[in-house]
Regions:
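Formylglycine-dependent sulfatase
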Residues: 1-246
Length: 246
């Protein structure tokens, strides 16, 4: 049905889509973490809906993002692996559908769908995104106006850019805002205010720390990214701290 701007604003929900990247469920206290406290995520979980039985067919960054925006498997939206792009002309895309219904649409932060290679964010009234993974400190943001380097920590910057847009948006219309953070994707580089967060905290070894996987499935025994064998530059994306080098 067609609605006037006023009618649409009255019935349409405001949509704020916050994404954290490569964020393990066991690093969220709403899912039982005793080390990582996430009070704001917990509040949303307790007052909203917390999913406990979720699965993904292709857990890489780029295909996951393509699937979320299109509602299609990677082989359908042609975003199968890292390095692929999301064709701006591909249909459907969630933000395009909302835009056609009178929503203001915006995305800030990590896009990772080929912005430098023809994968321009389509269906967004405003977009300002990182190139690929982006940097934690002094990141480069890309928009229709070009590139700009913004001094500071990427999580704070992404949040501030989102807030700036929300404050100046057309309040006669509903909005769809994608606040897509880079963190906590590797390399793990905390912001200045959090760099000493665990300085005086004794972190208990997880019960599986010394597991030899002898009683696990073959697929589990072949898994990489283990602390014992794979905590290296290839895995961390930075040189490991001297204290944890074997």
């Amino acid at each position: 049905a067609n609605h006037s701007a006023g009618e649409l604003t009255a019935i349409a929900p405001y949509i704020l889509y916050i994404m954290s990247d490569d964020h393990a469920a066991h690093a969220i206290s709403a899912y039982g973490s005793q080390i990582n406290t996430t009070p704001h995520i917990d509040r949303i979980a307790h007052t909203g809906l917390r999913m406990t039985n979720c699965h993904v067919t292709n857990s890489l960054c780029t295909p996951s993002r393509g699937t979320i925006l299109t509602g299609q498997y990677g082989h359908k939206c042609n975003v199968r692996t890292i390095g692929d792009k999301l064709d701006p002309n591909h249909e459907p895309q969630m933000q395009k559908l909302l835009q056609k219904q009178g929503y203001q649409t915006a995305i800030v932060g990590k896009w990772h769908l080929g912005v430098r290679h023809g994968g321009i964010p389509a269906g967004f009234d405003y977009w300002e995104v990182l190139e690929g993974q982006g940097r934690y400190y002094d990141p480069v943001f890309i928009s229709e106006k070009g590139d700009r380097t913004i001094k500071g920590y990427v999580t704070d910057i992404t949040t501030d850019l989102c807030l700036d847009w929300l404050k100046q948006r057309d309040r006669s219309k509903p909005f769809f805002m994608c606040c897509h953070h880079k963190a906590p994707h590797r390399p793990w580089q905390p912001g200045p205010k959090y760099k000493d967060l665990f300085e005086d905290i004794n972190i208990v070894e997880p019960p599986t720390f010394n597991d030899d996987y002898s009683n696990r499935a073959e697929a589990a025994r072949r898994a990489e990214m283990t602390i014992e064998h794979h905590l290296n530059k290839n895995d961390l994306k930075i040189d490991p701290p001297a204290a944890v080098k074997g």
